[in-house]
């Protein structure tokens, strides 16, 4: 883990005390260094506190593994060995790592795109889905600019990312475009991506690997004079033109309530999986203008947030 990750881990562990200072322990796995997951975690900690489980009664052990299979597995294993009372994960890869490491500890996930399709399901697990309709994102994009080819940057080893890429292919006939799949296994591979002459827009999938390389991907798209779209919150601040994502506050709050119920003795099977009800649409007018894209007023009116 890099120095930066350790610093961020310390900053996010505001609700944690040294092991043994509280009656209960909650383990959390945050995939990569994503601003969206950081916001989810803040909402999670606040929600847990409102339910009566603050730093005086619960220790929070946060793991921020690099976005690769070995790191996810190691993070889950460390928390299982620590004998936490509940395990929480943000993103599908971390959730799958938890499933593989324990069948007895209650598990809670948040921010998972299409949980069932990604295999994020177990008898000792519940959570809140992070899926919003991809078709809605494409409708908004079509209002902004015509497109016949969309490049999707994803990771073949992150099942929710793969599912999103597959859904994009399924929407080709409805919207009249072709999908250009661009797989990367590590963030540094994003530098090799070429969009010019190949795509009219770029979708950065929900992949933790792809989102760690967001600044590189956005820059490559700028050079190709094409917009970037996303379904991960916080990406518009990095130059994404159009972002449609589930509210991180809702995701974290729901996870917090679920963990509180588990700490009180309920079983995961008695807590139904939730779906997002709050969706945030962010339009980056500044980036759109730099690309020569005129955003229609009705799209601006629909936006939850506009970056000027």
Predicted stretch roles:
Residues 21-308:
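Short hydrophobic alpha-helices and adjacent helix-cap/hinge residues
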């Amino acid at each position: 883990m890099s120095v930066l990750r350790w610093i961020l881990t310390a900053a996010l562990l505001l609700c944690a005390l040294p092991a043994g200072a509280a009656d209960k322990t909650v383990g959390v796995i945050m995939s990569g260094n994503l601003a969206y997951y950081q916001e989810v975690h803040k909402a999670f900690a606040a929600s847990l506190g409102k339910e009566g489980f603050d730093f005086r009664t619960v220790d929070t052990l946060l793991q921020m593994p690099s976005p690769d299979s070995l790191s996810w597995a190691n993070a889950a294993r460390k928390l299982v060995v620590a004998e936490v009372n509940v395990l929480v994960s943000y993103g599908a890869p971390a959730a799958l790592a938890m499933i593989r490491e324990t069948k007895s500890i209650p598990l809670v996930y948040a921010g998972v795109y299409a949980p069932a399709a990604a295999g994020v399901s177990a008898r000792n697990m519940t959570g809140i889905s992070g899926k919003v309709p991809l078709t809605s994102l494409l409708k908004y994009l079509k209002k902004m600019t015509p497109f016949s080819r969309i490049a999707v940057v994803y990771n073949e080893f992150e099942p929710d990312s793969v599912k999103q890429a597959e859904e994009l292919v399924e929407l080709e006939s409805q919207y009249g475009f072709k999908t250009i799949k661009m797989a990367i296994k590590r963030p540094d591979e994003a530098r090799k991506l070429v969009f010019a002459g190949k795509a009219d827009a770029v979708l950065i999938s929900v992949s933790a690997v792809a989102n760690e390389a967001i600044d590189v991907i956005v820059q490559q798209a700028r050079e190709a004079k094409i917009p970037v779209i996303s379904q991960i919150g916080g990406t518009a601040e990095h130059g994404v033109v159009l972002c449609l994502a589930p509210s991180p506050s809702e995701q974290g709050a729901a996870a917090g309530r679920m963990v509180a119920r588990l700490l009180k003795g309920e079983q995961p099977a008695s807590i139904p999986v939730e779906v997002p009800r709050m969706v945030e649409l962010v339009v980056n007018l500044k980036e759109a203008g730099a690309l020569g894209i005129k955003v229609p007023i009705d799209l601006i009116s629909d936006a939850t947030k506009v970056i000027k």
